């Protein structure tokens, strides 16, 4: 089914001019972030115009929106209370559980001592005895971490208080063989390498240093995200990533201690941290609730119009010396040919818009058919995968000043090639799925 668009009404007037200015400013900002070649000093986008020729639109399918469109980002802070989804409530309960666990568990040395001694106020410790500043001593020999409290002042007959300073000063040569039993070194005693930090320090790190772990979907998934391939996905696109519930970074402190000490038997009088049940995995992504009125349209979009984009730059000449002189450049894009599948999803006062890559479009709505009914190109061919959505771009370039009605230089191929490659890259990175734009209506 074809759709007729009142192109003049949509692109003219104050609203059309404002939209054109926003597009010009957006492309200009992207060029400012690029690394320019050595022979180009700067690029400025001066104007943008929609032209007078409208695109051709043909509706190909009507489906449910992509799951990614339901993801609730950090910028959606004005969502009403009725749009709170069950998955968001589950994530909120998860964070409340972490906060409650950190509040009730003794996370510092002061909290433990004040709780055991029964004082109403926490015990004030000297700076040298502060739990946050107390670190295990390190030996030059790889004996692991040695806690100074393991070596109190030993008693000497006839001298009250003893004379040993081993608890305060560690000899540079480490411990002698008579002081470190061989069995202790081989069985993972605190003197051996790889001995974990004390449970007290682990609790302090958890209570004050780390806080609740960040969601996997916000950090790990986005860091390794690449455009999903949908060659064999049927009618749905691949999800952006999965959350692993067995991530060792999110394991419980008590489980980590027991794992490092297989022979240790948990004591009933241990810290309440060991009695807290492990948290069940990581919270899911924030997703808005799906409703029956949500819909998504696949639309074949063809355009061969006179859209225009004007850019100015300065080209540097290296003769007779590097960057000897700069020539002004004016580059005009006077039209382009475009063919792609657009996705338009409506979800409760939000419109999500993007284009599909050629292979994604073939997987979802089938390959494009020609006038004779056959496929215009093999769906999985290498040529189609490398085909850009911007099929053809018409460019006019003027370099140098006019002298006697003639240009000093014309149509420098390197400059045109660079600008066209950057225009294609901006379009594909910003408008092709999984990238999409959201508009509030």
Curated annotation (Swiss-Prot):
One Pfam family in the UniProt entry: MMM1
Annotated Polar residues bias: 226-245, 253-263
UniProt-recorded name of the protein: Mitochondrial distribution and morphology protein 12
PROSITE patterns attached to this UniProt entry: SMP (PS51847)
Family annotation (CDD domains): SMP_Mdm12
S-S bonds: none
Chief localisation class: mitochondrion
Top-rank lineage group of the source organism: Eukaryota
UniProt function note: Component of the ERMES/MDM complex, which serves as a molecular tether to connect the endoplasmic reticulum (ER) and mitochondria. Components of this complex are involved in the control of mitochondrial shape and protein biogenesis, and function in nonvesicular lipid trafficking between the ER and mitochondria. MDM12 is required for the interaction of the ER-resident membrane protein MMM1 and the outer mitochondrial membrane-resident beta-barrel protein MDM10.
Chain's gene name: MDM12
Keyword Oxidoreductase: no
Oligomer status and interactors: Component of the ER-mitochondria encounter structure (ERMES) or MDM complex, composed of MMM1, MDM10, MDM12 and MDM34. A MMM1 homodimer associates with one molecule of MDM12 on each side in a pairwise head-to-tail manner, and the SMP-LTD domains of MMM1 and MDM12 generate a continuous hydrophobic tunnel for phospholipid trafficking.
One Gene Ontology molecular-function label: lipid binding
Membrane topology according to the record: Peripheral membrane protein
Domain SMP-LTD span(s) in chain numbering: 1-441
Cited InterPro entries: Mdm12, MMM1_dom, SMP_LBD
A GO cellular component annotation in the UniProt record: ERMES complex
Transmembrane segment boundaries: none
Keywords tagged on the record: Endoplasmic reticulum, Lipid transport, Lipid-binding, Membrane, Mitochondrion, Mitochondrion outer membrane, Transport
Protein's cellular compartments: Mitochondrion outer membrane; Endoplasmic reticulum membrane
Gene Ontology BP annotations: mitochondrial genome maintenance; mitochondrion-endoplasmic reticulum membrane tethering; phospholipid transport; protein insertion into mitochondrial outer membrane
Membership in a protein family: Belongs to the MDM12 family.
Domain comment (free text): The SMP-LTD domain is a barrel-like domain that can bind various types of glycerophospholipids in its interior and mediate their transfer between two adjacent bilayers.
Ranges for region Disordered: 68-89, 183-289
